[in-house]
Curated annotation (Swiss-Prot):
The chain crosses the membrane at residues 4-24, 42-62, 69-89, 93-113, 131-151, 158-178, 199-221, 245-265, 269-289, 293-313, 331-351, 356-376. It comes from Escherichia coli O157:H7. One of its GO terms (molecular function) is transmembrane transporter activity. Its main location: membrane. Residues 25-41, 90-92, 152-157, 222-244, 290-292, 352-355 are periplasmic. Confers resistance to chloramphenicol. One of its GO terms (biological process) is response to antibiotic. This is Multidrug resistance protein MdtL.
Length: 391
């Protein structure tokens, strides 16, 4: 079992590493490529677009051909495009490389969640996804620090070579450690089981909405945090970095505590707790009389996301044994596109950073609480749990 956990964690971590590690080198990248920093900030969106594009096909391929045939090319593409970005001499080539890099990371991301669906029962999967969420929270803190240390002695290209090395490690794990987990195709007489795993299932759709809104909350916070903390609250850059590190610490602590909480409380209880924390954060930020109270509201956001997201993802994947890849892709596409659409629309309409965050917090909590209360899970699928045979 440990091999599947190690491989899944490694496959997922390419996604945040590809986002956070290069940011520290952005000024030098812009100077070398004769582009403005503003022009290269689109590299973040381009990378996410590549991930979303990968999710359109990766899940279906993983369900038909297996997890390894998607993970291996995905990791290989991530390696090649990381090297390509390091060799780019124009901003156009750099952005093209970033799109393809996101494509590779997206393939790996989809496979990771499909593997966990294949090999873990509902309760263990919820615990593991909570741990994975905590580990993912470490990357936005550690990646820029690692990037800064690398750039003390090496040029910005070394950041992408470091990503390539990470990709090589994932490729080696996928080739030699990971074993195939895709369940055997059902016999002709059992096709009804495959047909019953519909993406239009009410319970699955409710969890898609909940996880998409939750991701929208956390990404809205990340995107608006410089404005909120430095422009509105007046913190210095160093203080901003410290606050963000502390919020990551809150996320990690809650994420690592959630598996223990699942041994005491029902998953539904933790999901309700998550949304109540979001609602409390929205109210706190609305009526906040001081910066200290506002910072407390921000910690509630991080705690709320960490306590509920892994559980919601586990529940979303629960009904799917034969279509776990497609389900994982659907979740990923909805989360990436839904959160990006909200942030873009809010910016176009001219909603302030403060109101943007408060609005999504309150909307997420109200909609999600209603869905948790009134959309119950169907009959669990368990026949495929614990893979004992591998292709």
């Amino acid at each position: 079992m440990s091999r599947f956990l190690i491989c899944s964690f490694a496959l997922v971590l390419l996604y945040p590493a590809g986002i956070d590690m290069y940011l520290v080198g952005l000024p030098r990248i812009a100077a070398d490529l004769n582009a403005s920093e503003a022009q290269l900030h689109i590299a973040f969106s381009v990378y996410l677009a590549g991930m979303a594009a990968a999710m359109l096909f990766a899940g279906k391929v993983a369900d038909r051909s297996g997890r390894k045939p998607v993970a291996i090319p995905g990791a290989a593409l991530f390696i090649i495009t990381s090297v390509f970005c390091s060799l780019a001499e124009t901003s156009t080539l750099f952005l093209a490389g970033r799109f393809l890099q996101g494509l590779g990371a997206g393939c790996c991301y989809v496979v990771a969640f499909a593997i966990l669906r294949d090999t873990l029962d509902d309760r263990r999967r919820a615990k593991v996804l909570s741990l994975l969420n905590g580990i993912t929270c470490i990357i936005p803190v550690l990646a820029p620090v690692l990037g800064h240390l690398i750039m003390l002695k090496f040029p910005w290209q070394s950041l992408f070579w470091t990503m390539a090395i990470m990709g090589i490690a994932v490729l080696m794990l996928s080739l030699f450690i990971l074993k195939e987990t895709r369940p055997a195709a059902p016999a002709a007489s059992d096709k009804s089981r495959e047909n019953s795993e519909s993406l239009l299932n009410r319970f699955f759709l409710s969890r898609v909405v909940i996880t998409t809104l939750s991701v929208s909350v956390i990404l809205t916070f990340v995107n608006t945090s410089p404005v909120l903390l430095m422009e509105i609250m007046g913190f210095e850059r160093g203080e901003y970095a410290t606050i963000m590190a502390l919020t990551a610490g809150v996320s990690m602590t809650v994420s690592f505590s959630t598996p223990f909480a699942l041994g005491i409380f029902k998953p539904r209880t933790l999901m309700i707790t998550s949304q109540v924390l979001f609602l409390a954060a929205g109210i706190t930020l609305t009526v906040s009389p001081s910066h200290a109270v506002s910072l407390f509201g921000i910690t509630l956001i991080c705690a709320g996301f960490s306590v509920g997201f892994g559980v919601a993802m586990s529940q979303a994947l629960g009904p799917f044994s034969l279509r776990a890849g497609v389900a994982s892709s659907t979740l990923g596409i909805a989360q990436v596109c839904g959160s990006s659409l909200w942030i873009w629309l809010a910016a176009v309409v001219g909603i302030s950073a403060w109101n943007m965050l408060i609005g999504i917090l309150i909307a997420c909590s109200i909609v999600s609480l209603l869905l948790i209360m009134f959309v119950a899970p169907g009959r669990p699928v368990t026949a495929h749990e614990e893979i004992h045979h591998h292709a």
